[in-house]
Amino acid sequence: SEFKYRAQKIINYVADDYKWDASGWYNCNNPSDYGKYNWPIVVASFQKYGINNPKGNQYLTHFNTESCIYNRFHFNVVGETYIFTHYWDAPSVKSNIKDYLTAAWNRTDSYNLFTSEGTENHLAMTRTAAYLYAQIAKDSFPNDFPNAAQKLAEMKSWLMDWAAMLYTSGPGEWNSSTYLPFSITGWLALYDGAKDPDVRLVARAVLDYYAAEVALHYTQGITGGYESRNSSGYESVVNYGDYVGWLWFGESPKKITFTPGSQNNEAATAVYAASSTYRPPMAVVKLASKADILNSMYYNSKGEYLLNNPGAIKQTFYVGKTFTLGAAYLPYGGFTGGDTQFQMWKFVGKVAPDTTITAKTANVIVGYGGKEWNKARGRMPWD
């Protein structure tokens, strides 16, 4: 299928051509969230070559050191629990799993598994990983982690509550082409790796929500309309979420290629979705084509970032035959001191596709009114 072709293209790049050097750019102190850059290589290597692949098996052992293994939070734990649940019989999983689990379980500061703080996508990564770690602890090491069943129940409750809130209020990081893959990776891991059928169902519901959000706004490799927490993405298939959109729905105006030895982390992060058994519903795939919603206006609203003040943010999104235009209005001020990461409106115009070239993009015009680096903007510029 076309999806399998796109998925394999991403897997091949990350397994074979994505820059890998376990002693350099990928070390555990710079950046501290080394899992963001390393774990996709493990996933791709196991997915393409099997669980005995030497390259894939070197990473868990390499990072099982006192200084590295302490960094058990968001980007790190979500990738490793994806690996543990998908490739349980890999030699490096068998030899390292208890060390990683113990380090994560025993962390008690504000980056701990069960009550950690952070952004919305940080919590999504950490809590989904906490559930899977609790499942592993309960099933494989019950004597070492006697409270595993209690923690598993607590995390199930959190997952259920958060999913219900998603469908009630929407996310705080709505339509974010920067953080989409980080918001869904843990739910992909649950969809494939949770043993509780209720948890798998709720993971499916969360993934369907995000897939529908992408499908509605996606045009020729670009996330259209308003975005919460984004600071780039003005060309087709260059941003994190746009690679997920391309994987799920295709429709790129250009040829997608990957340079051997490059560090395209935006593409590499999509390997979790490429390796998962999750597929968007056919209704969502059809929505992405826009065929049945031409010349339609979509209205919605969102709460503020912490989901308080429901409906405060008003959104409109128009789907024309050759373009989309979306805007969001935030009726509160306080845009001072730094990057608000709100992209308040965006126009995306279609172009004639040419898959023989690699440098073509849909036309994009972006409203910077609510997104400026280190400049106070006050309220919205059209107030």
Enumerate the predicted regions with their spans.
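General "foldedness" signal
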Residues: 144, 217, 224, 228, ...
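Ser/Thr/Asn(+Pro)-rich, low-complexity disordered segments
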Residues: 1-125, 137, 148-159, 251-383
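Eukaryote-skewed repeat-based solenoidal scaffolds used as protein-protein interaction platforms
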Residues: 65, 84-180, 184, 188-215, ...
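Extended amphipathic alpha-helical segments with heptad-repeat/coiled-coil character used for oligomerization
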Residues: 184, 188, 197-265
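Intrinsically disordered, low-complexity regions enriched in Ser/Pro/Gly/Gln/His and often acidic
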Residues: 32, 167, 239-241
